[in-house]
Amino acid sequence: VTGHSCGGLTTLLFMSRYPDKAGGGISYMQACFGKLSSKYKVKKNGVEKAMAKFRKKNQGPHDLRQKMNDEIKNNLIAPILAFTHPKDKYEGLLSDWLEEIPGMKRIVISEDYKINGKSCKRKGDDWEEPVKKGHDMDVGLCFQYYNPVILNYIASRTK
């Protein structure tokens, strides 16, 4: 099972609830609750203050997010591959909780908009543009650098 953004969080939630229904999961930039990292200034204020402000302004979504994250942390047993980026405005600076999950392989893609020293671009048949958002790093051609990691993960889950 794999997903990006809210699909990434859904992948984690699915695998925590139904570990016997799929061989594994790959999550890309998990996030379902808006641009929390940027809107609540996580870099400047820290995680605790930012989340307190989010809860004050949006208690229902905050509590649902916390409930889902706790469920994932407490129940996820299958090895999962998760990609995050610190410049992801959604949850890029709020992903450290993934490190608490046994079997989780979290990959912080890069600290900037390059992977392995190469600028990230998206290409079409007759267009090309730089990837300008951390949330979109997995759609850049440079993300192919991680193909061996992904293929090794898939191979490890199909044995």
Question: Which residues does each predicted region cover?
Answer:
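Primarily recognizes the serine-hydrolase "nucleophile elbow" in alpha/beta-hydrolase
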Residues: 1-45
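The feature captures the conserved acid-bearing segment of alpha/beta-hydrolase catalytic domains
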Residues: 32-106
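C-terminal catalytic histidine-bearing segment of alpha/beta-hydrolase fold enzymes
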Residues: 104-159
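Sec/Tat-exported extracytoplasmic proteins
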Residues: 18, 29, 84, 154-158
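Active-site-proximal beta-strand/loop segments in catalytic clefts of secreted hydrolases
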Residues: 2-5, 28-31, 83-88, 109-112
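Extracytoplasmic/periplasmic, Sec-exported soluble proteins
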Residues: 6, 72, 138-142
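A general secondary-structure boundary signal
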Residues: 28-29, 95, 120
